[in-house]
């Protein structure tokens, strides 16, 4: 897409009061360091010094145009954002200077559309409601967001563990809290950034949890996360039709999804949270879905209520993502780690660690 009138102004390092990472123009393949001037704070907004920001596949898919040609430039991704408030808008009353808060996938929701008025602000009809669409996201040393979309970080959650709860955490927690009941047999497919959190949530929801993985070496670690059992992907076909699970949380976006659906009990629920690039679609056997009376549930991140609840749940049960941390100056290495390697299990950036002292305050 063409350039747009951005609130954040790209400038020289000398003029800048913040530093970001993203693309300045269409066609770039290597992420750039982008110095910029912060926008004027609106009455209902807060400015935070970003302490940690997560690196998520969504950021890469979106900014690289893998979900469609609707990216505006400059594009600064980032939607797992935690930091401390350094400035308050005139009408802000919910928070105070120094509070540790976070922002997730949506901002600037209209509050008026069908989705917003039916508890689905994460599906707001206004495209600009996505945190990094037509404004800078959280891959930056500083971030401006609305008071209404900020969430206080419970003191029980270390800040370096908090960022990934704002996407990976809420993405699995939101549908799980609606579909899972204590005593259910729950399968989690794909024990990566999403799956390792889904296992912990399912365990503390009072279920019997099975981690389903194609990596035998992860078995002990999966058990340590709270799983009661581990099923290797190579053994899935042997169990088709046996009715193993009330609910399956599918965290993978590629491969034969249909084989996992057929592990459900009659009337079971299949939650799909893994999203591939556009065009990489999967096929499922509609006949088996109908005959098994299965329910297929799609879910994308969560709304503000879901975010508040996942933070409280994580704080209560000490559920934290396993995170690899990188310095801000190594941001491109962190992106490469997420895109092309297999981190255990999420990657976050220490944003107050740039080589420029003025951006670390």
Located regions from the model:
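C-terminal hydrophobic helical "lid"/dimerization subdomain
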Residues: 2-16, 204, 304-361
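Glycine-rich beta-strand-centered segment in the early N-terminal region that forms part
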Residues: 37-53, 66-114, 151-157
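Short glycine-centered segments of the SAM/dcSAM-binding site in methyltransferase folds
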Residues: 100, 185, 268-269, 295
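NAD(P)H dinucleotide-binding glycine-rich loop of Rossmann-like/cofactor-binding domains
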Residues: 109-189
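Adenosine-nucleotide cofactor-binding segment
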Residues: 182, 188-191, 203-259
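N-terminal Rossmann-fold NAD(P) dinucleotide-binding loop
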Residues: 195-196
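Helix-to-beta-strand junctions that scaffold the AdoMet/dcAdoMet cofactor pocket
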Residues: 264-266
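Rossmann-fold NAD(P)-binding glycine/threonine-rich loop
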Residues: 275-292, 304-310
